[in-house]
Amino acid sequence: MPLPDTFSESVRIAVIGGTGISALEAEGFTAVASLDIQTPYGAPGSPLTILKTPQNTPIAFLSRHGLHHELTPTEIPNRANIAALRSIGVRSIIAFSAVGSLQEHIRPRDFVVPSQIIDRTKGLRASTFFEGGLVGHVGFADPFDSELSKVVFDIGSDGVLNGEGVKMHKDALLICMEGPQFSTRAESNLYRSWGGDVINMSALPEAKLAKEAEIAYVMVCMSTDYDCWKTNEAAVTVETVMGNMHANGANAKHLAAAILKELAKEEHQDLVGAKHLEGLSKWACCTAPAGRKAEVVKKIEFMLPGYFS
């Protein structure tokens, strides 16, 4: 039976699934709606599935690469994804992503919470909501929300992850590359020389756009391989990635359920509501009211109503 296509409650938390996580199937979670939202930036990568947690908290789930993994990293409609989530009230995002490890101590099937990022995409992805008559410069010194990251790391370090020797790491440097091809060995070793810990293809501009939308954002990285720097390891292949991703999938769902249970507590409600980010984009706008193009203001106010008009 099809799910309802409307949902009247505000949804403050979203989970974005990446490679290997196209649905959020955790014990006690109940799907209650499926929303097809059209934004001024197009349609998101998948419908927004609204679920109720065992704590009766409504959350949104979005499959970054589409329901059938049909979107390459470059093709992901990042602006539509973030705008759609913010338009239904989302203020916190827990995003999952498969990554390659650039360091020996981060083993395949380990989980990582990054704190910094280096952008190695190639300018092919729309990376801002400020454009064409509306200029804004939102700070991005700390790309991942530190308080939300702490909650995620603490939960992940508390026996939630299954598997012998599986660890949760924090304060990692994430490299985001264009893809869809994997790195050359020279590139992989270059990123290691920069201090890179893990590498993926999807953190940007997702994290940048979330910050512009005043959404607290954290990425949970799931290590699938050693990229290709480790010469005594076979070069990374899709088969390697998908095999480890399958093993990571169950852990990701356990972790997501535990994080959402923790975030339902009263002590985290200001964090979940991103109170510390309110007004960030409004005050970052440099364009005088007389110079703001109405059509651009209308687009961005789809998710930030009344900010610039």
From Swiss-Prot:
GO molecular function: S-methyl-5-thioadenosine phosphorylase activity
Binding site residues for phosphate: T19, R64, H65, S97, A98, S202
Record has rRNA processing as a keyword: no
Subcellular location as annotated: Cytoplasm; Nucleus
Pathway listed: Amino-acid biosynthesis; L-methionine biosynthesis via salvage pathway; S-methyl-5-thio-alpha-D-ribose 1-phosphate from S-methyl-5'-thioadenosine (phosphorylase route): step 1/1
Catalysed reaction, written as an equation: S-methyl-5'-thioadenosine + phosphate = 5-(methylsulfanyl)-alpha-D-ribose 1-phosphate + adenine
SUPFAM superfamilies named among the record's database cross-references: Purine and uridine phosphorylases
Pfam families, per the entry: PNP_UDP_1
Positions that bind substrate: M201, D225, Y226, D227
Key word DNA damage present: no
Gene Ontology BP terms: L-methionine salvage from methylthioadenosine; purine ribonucleoside salvage
Keywords for the protein's UniProt record, in alphabetical order: Cytoplasm, Glycosyltransferase, Nucleus, Purine salvage, Transferase
EC annotation from Swiss-Prot or TrEMBL: 2.4.2.28
Enzyme class: transferase
Domain of life, source organism: Eukaryota
Gene Ontology cellular component terms for the protein in this record: cytosol; nucleus
Site (Important for substrate specificity): S183, V238
Subunit structure of this chain's protein: Homotrimer.
Summary of the function given for this chain in its UniProt record: Catalyzes the reversible phosphorylation of S-methyl-5'-thioadenosine (MTA) to adenine and 5-methylthioribose-1-phosphate. Involved in the breakdown of MTA, a major by-product of polyamine biosynthesis. Responsible for the first step in the methionine salvage pathway after MTA has been generated from S-adenosylmethionine. Has broad substrate specificity with 6-aminopurine nucleosides as preferred substrates.
HAMAP family documented for this protein: MTAP
Family in the record: Belongs to the PNP/MTAP phosphorylase family. MTAP subfamily.
Name of the protein this chain belongs to: S-methyl-5'-thioadenosine phosphorylase
Organism, scientific name: Tuber melanosporum (strain Mel28)
